[in-house]
């Protein structure tokens, strides 16, 4: 009928992934961190303890609260920017139908960037963040307990487990707080879908349908989706399968509590990710002021919508 359909692979969510054990050893009750100010105060407290050497005996490599991989275009250009926009637009279709970016919560975006950068080792020279990539943030940061917090999602669980399962099991997820809007939520969405090529041979299409049904609906397939893939199921008939991945459990908790915002970034025009990331990187490098960065973001969005 001219429409494209897909089966969602999983539900994914991202926020401030944190090392629960480090926070506990610092005397910080993470369950109270449900607002911007509370998270900011906790990060300041933890950074002070790191700088004083109080945690050095147990965590000899711990040098900063956070790392932020600004080199990866999808981190600032999609995920960070999505957070304030998800408080402004109901869904990706609404943003996609707009000729203007909007960015009603620009001040909240500034506050979020401050929160995510002022507790990094690059706090005195944010241009250094533009050289930080995913592997530095995860494998060379969170996984070796060099830092305690990163902006990431439950998709990093399997990688962390492969590096150090003990550390992987310490992970939790704090909200990605949009000050003055939604401060206790995480963005949740579907990033990947299974599709069947309509031009394939009929036997291939039928076999593909059987495989997808088996993977997502059989007892064996469900366990693979949850345990091996580390996914949060996108279907409601998984009550008999317990999620084992710590970060996926956290995403499910936010969903169950109704503490989620949408992935409106799926409504960005083609080519916007690279441009928006360059705008963020220009801000970090000092090429733009924050207000100039916002104007660049709006202009890039508008140009691509023409």
Predicted regions and their residues:
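Long, aromatic- and glycine/proline-rich binding clefts that accommodate carbohydrate-like moieties
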Residues: 174-176, 225-277, 281-282, 306
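Glycine-centered hinge/linker elements that transmit conformational signals in sensory
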Residues: 43-44, 95-131
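Extracytoplasmic/periplasmic substrate-recognition and gating elements
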Residues: 26, 163-228
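Extracytoplasmic/periplasmic solute-binding protein
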Residues: 3-9, 14, 40-98, 147
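Short helix-initiation/N-cap motifs at beta->coil->alpha
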Residues: 34-40, 128-143
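A structural signal for short loop-to-beta-strand junctions that line the ligand-binding cleft
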Residues: 1-23, 56, 63-64, 182-187, ...
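Paired acidic/hydrophobic, glycine-rich loop segments that form the ligand-binding mouth/hinge
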Residues: 148-153, 172
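Short, solvent-exposed loop/beta-turn-alpha elements that line the ligand-binding surface or hinge
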Residues: 57-66, 70, 87-111, 162-165, ...
């Amino acid at each position: 009928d001219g429409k494209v359909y897909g089966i969602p692979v999983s539900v994914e969510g991202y926020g401030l992934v944190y090392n629960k054990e480090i926070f506990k050893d610092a005397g910080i009750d993470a369950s109270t961190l449900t607002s911007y100010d509370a998270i900011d105060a906790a990060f300041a407290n933890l950074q002070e303890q790191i700088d004083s050497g109080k945690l050095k005996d147990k965590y000899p490599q711990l040098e900063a609260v956070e790392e932020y991989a600004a080199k990866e275009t999808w981190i600032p250009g999609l995920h960070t920017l999505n957070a304030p926009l998800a408080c402004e637009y109901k869904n990706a279709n609404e943003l996609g139908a707009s000729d203007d970016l909007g960015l009603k919560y620009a001040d909240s975006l500034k506050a979020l960037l401050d929160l995510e950068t002022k507790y990094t080792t690059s706090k005195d020279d944010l241009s250094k963040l533009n050289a930080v990539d995913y592997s530095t943030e995860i494998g060379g940061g969170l996984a070796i307990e060099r830092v305690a917090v990163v902006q990431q999602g439950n998709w990093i669980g399997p990688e962390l487990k492969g590096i150090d399962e003990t550390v992987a099991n310490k992970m939790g997820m704090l909200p990605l707080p949009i000050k003055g809007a939604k401060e206790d939520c995480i963005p949740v969405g579907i990033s990947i879908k299974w599709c069947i090529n309509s031009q394939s041979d009929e036997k291939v299409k039928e076999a593909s349908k059987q495989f997808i049904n088996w993977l997502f609906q059989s007892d064996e397939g469900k366990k693979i989706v949850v345990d091996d893939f580390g996914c949060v199921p996108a279907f409601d008939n998984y009550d008999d399968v317990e999620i084992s991945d710590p970060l996926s459990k956290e995403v499910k908790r936010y969903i169950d509590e109704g503490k989620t915002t949408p992935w409106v970034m799926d409504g960005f025009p083609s080519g916007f990710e690279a441009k928006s990331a360059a705008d963020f990187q220009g801000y970090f490098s000092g090429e733009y002021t924050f207000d100039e960065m916002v104007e660049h973001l709006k202009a890039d969005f508008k140009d691509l919508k023409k």
